[in-house]
Amino acid sequence: MEYLKIEGEFPKLANCAVTMGKFDGIHRGHRKLVEKIRERKTLGEQAVLFAIDASSNMILTRQERASILEKLGVDVLVECQLNDRIRHMKAENFIKEILMGDLGASYVVVGEDNRFGFESNLF
């Protein structure tokens, strides 16, 4: 599994199935999301997990989380700090610029309680 810690510019990926959230612990719901993106590998897509770095409230260490996600079939783990750019980005811009633009998402799946975008309780 490739691990990308974003501190500036996002990587340019293509043809990706993406799930996103904090993933501070890997519970049954998280596993189902990973299963959905992993299923897209049969279509030639990479399974990408976009995680907001919530290190102060993590249940697992970064290494534990990465190890579990790799075993579950994630190809790329993208970890990003919740910075002002993301925090103040409208949902539509986040989808266009980051998910579809930078991460090359052709498929996105999130949990039913996931919220993102300015004034929408991002992650």
Can you name each region flagged by the protein language model?
Residues 1-123:
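Nucleotidyltransferase catalytic core that binds NTPs
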